């Protein structure tokens, strides 16, 4: 029987937000709860598979409930913690979890492999490569023999000397937005199991760092040139002698040396693996200046002026600077303050929906007042305290979304959201 341990820490941390992520922000899974996270263990369909094109899904497209590659495999749960994007993780929290993972692996006895389920953009004060540090600590415990297969977000970072060196099989999502998150995890698990079962030993790896730093707003795989770039991945991965290839955009919202794009591949034919990785990396570099924002850009004052003057409705403005989907504080009030300077909005001539500002105290007060109730609040500006700070509002509660928020949280913790 093949024994494979499961562990990992999964969060996207912006180093430009003052918010610190704590243990309370994470769903912590151990034992049976951890095993039930993965559909190939529970013999369930892959979440979101109907949203993934056949070319991207590959062998996972028509996966049976009982995966043949998962036969006679013992999955050993260690620890997995995942959170919504946020700020850097408290150092003591990370070091506690690192110790728990290492202790768990030491007590687990012999394992043939490790399934390393990570994001790749976790930040911790005092560390410039958290995932690299974690895999190095794991290798110190288990040694060089167990085969490590890593599943990552394409907005993660691959450090050559630590993460790339410490893992044997690395793959990442092929879609942004990440509808294929669970397809990618399943591909990583299948590849690890099949490789261990084959008896061929560890594959040949190749990596090319691409000196590009791009935000997610420029790299949707639904648009060019990212569509063509990621379209190359399954084609190269299908070559004889190549097992898999991944393209990492990297993470723009952390000030760390490892933050850059990369292409990684592995297989048994060294020339084809290296040639395939090089081909994709060269195309990536060639089209680097073609990655553009999907809409016109402007300052917030100018953007609101344009929205008010426009005849197009609805008019959507996206503040990509305070982006909670990439770890922003989500309580910066600059845009709200600018909106409230326009009499067309404050006077009711135009309606505006502002989504969202993080302020749990305001939510509690609104919940207490109830639908239809009035509250006086100082909204936002409590986490990121830079000007203009909290905005004083007299507000009426028009709906209660507490149940919806609880459902979203539960869905995230159960692994039902594609980007979890």
Language-model segments: residues:
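N-terminal amphipathic/basic leader segments beginning at the initiator methionine
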Residues: 1-67
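Hard-cation-handling environments
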Residues: 2, 214-420
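Low-complexity, highly charged intrinsically disordered N-terminal segments
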Residues: 53-105
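Hydrophobic, Leu/Ile/Phe/Ala-enriched alpha-helical segments that form helix-helix packing faces
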Residues: 59-69, 101, 105, 138, ...
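Cap/lid and interdomain-hinge subdomains that line or gate substrate/regulatory clefts
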Residues: 69-70, 75-79, 85, 122, ...
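Gly-rich Lys/Arg/Thr-decorated short loops/hinges at beta-loop-alpha junctions or inter-strand turns
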Residues: 77-86, 117-119, 280-289
């Amino acid at each position: 029987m093949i024994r494979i341990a499961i562990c990992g820490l999964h969060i996207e941390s912006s180093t430009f937000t003052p918010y610190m992520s704590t243990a309370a922000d994470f769903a912590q899974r151990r034992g049976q709860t951890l095993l039930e996270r993965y559909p190939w263990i529970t013999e369930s369909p892959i979440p979101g598979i109907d949203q993934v094109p056949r070319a991207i899904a590959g062998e996972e497209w028509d996966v049976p409930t009982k995966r043949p590659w998962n036969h006679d495999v013992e999955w050993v749960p260690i620890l997995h913690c995942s959170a919504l994007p946020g700020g850097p993780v408290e150092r003591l929290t990370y070091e506690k979890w690192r110790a728990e993972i290492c202790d768990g692996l030491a007590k687990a006895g012999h394992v043939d492999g490790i399934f390393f389920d990570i994001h790749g953009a976790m930040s911790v004060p005092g560390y410039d490569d958290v995932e690299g540090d974690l895999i190095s600590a794991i290798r110190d415990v288990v040694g060089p023999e167990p085969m490590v297969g890593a599943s990552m977000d394409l907005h993660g970072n691959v450090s050559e000397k630590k993460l790339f060196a410490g893992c044997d099989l690395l793959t990442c999502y092929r879609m942004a937005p990440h509808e294929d998150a669970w397809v990618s995890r399943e591909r990583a698990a299948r590849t690890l199991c099949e490789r261990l079962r084959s008896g061929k030993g560890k594959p040949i790896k190749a990596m090319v760092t691409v000196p590009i730093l791009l935000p997610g707003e420029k790299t949707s795989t639904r648009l060019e040139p990212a569509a063509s770039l990621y379209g190359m991945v399954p084609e190269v991965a299908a070559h004889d002698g190549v097992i898999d290839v991944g393209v990492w955009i990297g993470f723009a919202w952390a000030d760390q040396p490892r933050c850059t794009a990369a292409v990684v591949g592995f297989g048994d034919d060294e020339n084809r693996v290296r040639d395939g990785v090089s081909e994709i990396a060269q195309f990536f570099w060639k089209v680097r200046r073609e990655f553009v924002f999907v809409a016109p850009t402007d300052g917030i004052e100018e953007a609101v002026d344009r929205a008010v003057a426009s005849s197009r409705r609805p008019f959507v403005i996206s503040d990509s600077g305070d982006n909670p989907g990439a770890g922003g504080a989500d309580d910066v009030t600059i845009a709200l303050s600018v909106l409230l300077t326009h009499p067309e909005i404050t006077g009711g001539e135009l309606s505006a929906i502002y989504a969202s500002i993080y302020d749990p105290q305001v939510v509690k007060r609104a919940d207490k007042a109830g639908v239809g109730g009035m509250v006086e609040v100082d909204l936002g500006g409590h986490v990121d305290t830079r000007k203009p700070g909290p905005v004083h509002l007299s507000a009426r509660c028009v709906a209660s979304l507490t149940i919806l928020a609880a459902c979203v949280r539960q869905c995230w913790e159960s692994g039902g959201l594609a980007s979890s």
